[in-house]
Amino acid sequence: PLYEHGFDAGVIEKVIGEPVAALMGGSYADKVEAQRRVVRCGLQLGYDCIPFERGMVSLVQNGQALMGHAPAIIKTMADVEAYPWDTKLDEYIRRFDEDFSALRDALPEGMKAVGGIGNGLFETLQDFVPFQELAFLQMDEPEVYELLWSRIGDMMVALWTWMLENHADSFAVCRFGDDLGFRSSTLINPADIRK
């Protein structure tokens, strides 16, 4: 197989019989070793690439609102304007540049990763405003709704530009996932997605 969307650290540990999760948050050498073990697992299972991403929602509410476990942090235009958008690129770099570098140092010749900046625009939007509240925001505060999409899009462009300029060589395919709905229908109007 070419690619798996994600390797769970617990599964990797069972496959290779060595710890991985504890190393991911350790020193740089630990992170490189963790990625080497992920690579070893991928190779052992017959994969040509390994999955690797560091998500945008880690900059918002760490996916808590996306999963329905946290309230909206954007409700008004003042909330959008007060949000520290201009700090998010630096925060992402501080948190994850070392992880991307460890990946590069761990990849054997001929192997690459698939991924990059995790979470798409819609998933990230829902970490600012959970899905149900998002529907109300769209109807009650359409200007806030539109501006929030735009600001998140700008943040995505900044993050992807940084990643591609600094770490693209580690990737065979750069991609993000965005859960937009189901087979039968999207969760929001397709026209909103196209914007």
What are these regions (language model features)?
Residues 1-31, 48-52, 65-195:
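Active-site loop segments of alpha/beta catalytic cores
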